[in-house]
Amino acid sequence: MTQSLTIRRPDDWHLHLRDGAMMRAVLPETARHFARAIIMPNLVPPVVTAQDALAYRDRIEAALPDGADFTPLMTLYLTEQTDPDDVEAAFADGLIHAVKLYPAGATTNSQSGVATLKNVYPVLERMAQIGLPLCIHGEVTDPQVDIFDREQAFIDTVLIPLRADLPDLKVTLEHITTSHGIDYVVGADGDIAGTITTHHLMINRNHMLVGGIRPHYYCLPIVKRASHQHALRRAATSGHPRFFLGTDSAPHLDGAKETACGCAGVFSATNTMSCLAHVFDEDGALVNLEAFTSLNGPARYGLAPNAATMTLEKRDHPTNYPAKFDTDDGPLTLFDPSTPLYWHVKD
């Protein structure tokens, strides 16, 4: 017998759409299931001003399929030259919903990010005053710190001092990958929340490294050991209001992934909801799927939940997803969850 679950239509609180041909290929995959998404600003060149954000939003809206019901929620890329007045005006106009902090060199297209945090304190102080959230890629870039330890080091040496200096700043610690990150978000005082990705719930570093290197599982923050994956699953499926979905769906062409020095990023927009239903079902927590995908995020960003609904069905045969998508510039590989998915989104 078919099992079904109806939830409010979900949102994605961390999404990379890229631009140009890639955006035209991947945007329909997000718009099919998600009503809204926080759009990452790490283009080349990055989205650093209100004018940049407006132009990017216009390009996204122009690329939407006919009849699509999708709202891009724009962000600005924080640099050491960011103007607090420009940020405040963009927020007041409803153009942006967050500012993104990339430590310089931490991930894809982060070269323009922040090298010295104190240099952006005037912007962060203004954000604290007006209630504008700061989304953080929480990893240090010190080459002496092991890549598997960079999230914990960031929390201990950067985030905790930052929040002590600016206790009123709204912070979203994005794509949490460790039990340390989960424990910090649960236990910290003040206005803190965290996003968790689809792929970090589904895989751990064994999936990436055992039996051969699988470049399409390479992402930043890098997948960790299974014990951290289990901590992420407990947090996501708990219904805790500080955790919500941010897929960090980050497409790269196969040629940029399947190479001697491949790019970091996982494209998961198409099958995310099937993956999440699988995780929550497996962990006996389907009752909390709606909170994670559809309720906690809007509450965090001061928005109402979507009025529309989505129905997921569990069938007795796996759902087949395309392994690859074609773009004008070459093929793109969809995230492989490494297990059959019996849940699907009902049309």
Swiss-Prot record:
Catalyzes the reversible cyclization of carbamoyl aspartate to dihydroorotate. It comes from Jannaschia sp. (strain CCS1). It catalyses: (S)-dihydroorotate + H2O = N-carbamoyl-L-aspartate + H(+). Zn(2+) 1 binds at H14, H16, K100, D248. GO terms for biological process: 'de novo' pyrimidine nucleobase biosynthetic process; 'de novo' UMP biosynthetic process. SUPFAM superfamilies: Metallo-dependent hydrolases. The gene is pyrC. GO terms for cellular component: cytosol. The active site is at D248. This is Dihydroorotase. Its EC number is 3.5.2.3. The modification N6-carboxylysine is found at K100. It comes from the Bacteria. Substrate binds at H16, L17, R18, N42, H137, L220, H252, A264. Homodimer. Pathway: Pyrimidine metabolism; UMP biosynthesis via de novo pathway; (S)-dihydroorotate from bicarbonate: step 3/3. PANTHER family: DIHYDROOROTASE (PTHR43137:SF1). Belongs to the metallo-dependent hydrolases superfamily. DHOase family. Class II DHOase subfamily. It is an enzyme of class 3 (hydrolase).
